[in-house]
Amino acid sequence: MLVETKARVGVFAIALGAYLPQFPTLVPEFEGQYAAFKKTLPDTVEVIDGGIVTTKEQSMAAGDKFRAADVDLVILQLLTYATSYNMLPAVRDLDVPVVLVNVQKKKAPDYANTDTPTWLGELYACGAVGEMVADLERA
């Protein structure tokens, strides 16, 4: 008898928490980007939502959720720059593949009319990918 099951995919997004008090408009921007990203995931998987992580404690909570669900894969959306402490507690000890998603939100920046929150929220393809990959390899 064939039993249909769905892969369990842990999904979360990260951003540097220090940006949020400085640029409060980033919060709804990141929430919108994360919601749109989750909608791209197929119905053929069970999504375990770790939320938007901006602190080590939130990362630990996401990791606890992923471990409890026994996820098969983790997908991490990099919303803007973040340090690896936002990532590692969520994925350490899972022994599953981790996919980093890092996409610039706008095709062509209007540099003359871009302010810091716009740069951080919509235009910055995360420069921390190298740091994340190096830390994943060491973890």
Segments (PLM) and residue ranges:
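Metallocofactor- and cofactor-centric catalytic cores in central/energy metabolism, strongly enriched
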Residues: M1-A139
